[in-house]
Swiss-Prot record:
Tissue specificity remark: Red blood cells.
Keyword Metal-binding set for record: yes
Name used for this protein in its record: Hemoglobin subunit beta-2
Keywords: Heme, Iron, Metal-binding, Oxygen transport, Transport
Highest taxon in the source lineage: Eukaryota
Classification of source organism: Eukaryota, Metazoa, Chordata, Craniata, Vertebrata
Subunit structure comment from the entry: Heterotetramer of two alpha chains and two beta chains.
Protein family according to the UniProt entry: Belongs to the globin family.
Binding site for heme b: H63, H92
Reported function: Involved in oxygen transport from the lung to the various peripheral tissues.
GO biological process: hydrogen peroxide catabolic process
Domain Globin: residue ranges: 2-146
Length: 146
């Protein structure tokens, strides 16, 4: 993947403003609410019976932070995302058996959450750069499945 200097700047500039625990929790909760079939991968998280329960669930919030922290690793390694996510791809494929389509779903929810939190800063150019990034990350996470 080739990143332009502008894309790299847009990604890193916005990322410097991101509240990882909040945005991560909101993105994961959003996916679990909007795509309820994804909840089957989180059966040990306790109460996921409603949007309110999901959004207030401490395990969802903690895992959302963990997920977005890993996403931050992609930003630190934009030129080597595939290798950055090799072990996570293996874990999600071989042990957790996560449908790789879910990586795309979470990426799309993340875009919506970023737009909601960072409105003016989330310009069309920034949106395009982040859309490219979530697609590259989803592809890297799905790599083990191919």
């Amino acid at each position: 993947v080739h990143w332009t200097a502008e894309e790299k700047q847009l990604i890193t500039c916005l990322w410097g403003k991101v509240d990882v625990p909040t945005v991560g929790a909101d993105a994961l909760a959003g996916m679990l609410v909007m795509y309820p079939w994804t909840q089957r991968f989180f059966a040990d998280f306790g109460n996921l019976s409603s949007a309110t329960a999901i959004c207030g669930n401490p395990k969802v919030r903690a895992h959302g932070k963990k997920v977005l922290t890993a996403f931050g690793d992609a930003i630190k390694n934009l030129d080597n995302i595939k290798d950055t996510f090799a072990k996570l791809s293996e874990l999600h494929c071989d042990k957790l058996h996560v449908d790789p389509e879910n990586f795309k779903l979470l990426g799309n929810v993340l875009i919506i959450v970023l737009a909601g939190h960072y409105g003016k800063d989330f310009t069309p150019a920034c949106h395009a750069a982040y859309q490219k990034l979530v697609n590259v990350v989803a592809h890297a996470l799905a790599r083990r499945y191919h």
